[in-house]
Amino acid sequence: MRHRRSAPFAFLLFLSLFGTAVAQDTPLLSGSVAFVTTTTGGNTTYIPLIQPLAAVPLGDHFMVESRAILLEQFIPNSTGYDHSHFDALNYLQGDYIATPHLTVVAGSYLLPFGTYNERLTPVWIGNFQDESLAEPIGQMATGVGLGGQVRGSLYSSAHTSFSYAAWFSARSGNLQFNSQRSAGGRGSFYFPVQRLEVGASYGRLLQGVHENFIGAHLWWQTEDGGFRLRSETMRGEHAYGYWFETDYRPFHDDASAGFMRRFEPLFRMQQTFRIDNVASDGVPAQNTQRADFGLDYNFPHNTRILSSYSRQFSSTGGVNIWETGIVYRFLFPAWK
């Protein structure tokens, strides 16, 4: 589990934002509480965490969104365990819904490059507790922009739709809102009959040595939702890579299967390739491949058990990685 930035009093800011909505429409408080472990080379790291999210509507056209994370990390050392604390405000943005086809976003937002950053980073959504090895490509070091964004559905029919997102971010060295000067966007076609989404992304770093990033994604699921495929490929100036992930609910519609229908076998394959080692971009320094095998269990009432085994290979050798976790997702109106 990688954390892009730290903010010592980020959660207080999150709560102060949340508290301003008393006189407004009912805000929603969502998020998760989790306890996860990672074992590598016989050493186990323990991480309890909470990841709250607030959505605060302000009338018919405005909304404020924010997500934070707080965790404690216990890392083994020669004498026992080191302990560290981490808290961060992942994003804090205001949305103006101008038309059914256009939403204007301002503030600190997750970069819409690819799909993983926006869709799968919440711990209650991702099947695996860590992101893909290639995910840092195109994320401008922090995965967060500070500035403006436009997004929406440009066209929609019974057979196809096209959605878009475009951003411009300023450079900021602020501890809570760390970002790089960049611009880019993403476009996606969705075919509801086939349950297929395909799209492409482009990003450009506009500070220091200017760099270009490109990406493409494909998501698909069967009609009953029992099998899902998610995949991305991305390329930057110094590295490129891909990942694809599948999950399967074998007894999705069979109530007679009892507790067995709640098991969810998973598989993820990922590779990264170095073009050079000029930049420190968060991608492994050597060509790396990794296979992840997982088995999740979905309890009633929004509780999941995550478990996975991974084998990672590179020129420096191979390593086994075991990960487990339990995640509870909560969602309720803050007040009425």
Name what the model sees in each region.
Residues 19-23:
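Sec/Tat signal peptide C-region and signal peptidase I cleavage site
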Residues 27, 32, 61-62, 188-280, ...:
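Detector for outer-membrane/organellar transmembrane beta-barrel domains
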Residues 50-52, 92, 148-150, 166, ...:
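Membrane-embedded beta-strands of outer-membrane beta-barrel proteins
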Residues 39-46, 71-86, 140-145, 172-181, ...:
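Solvent-exposed loop/turn segments connecting transmembrane beta-strands
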Residues 150, 319-336:
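Outer-membrane beta-barrel "beta-signal"
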Residues 1-9:
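Bacterial N-terminal signal peptides that target proteins for export
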Residues 25-31, 35, 41-171, 179-181, ...:
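Outer membrane beta-barrel
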Residues 9-18:
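Bacterial N-terminal signal peptides
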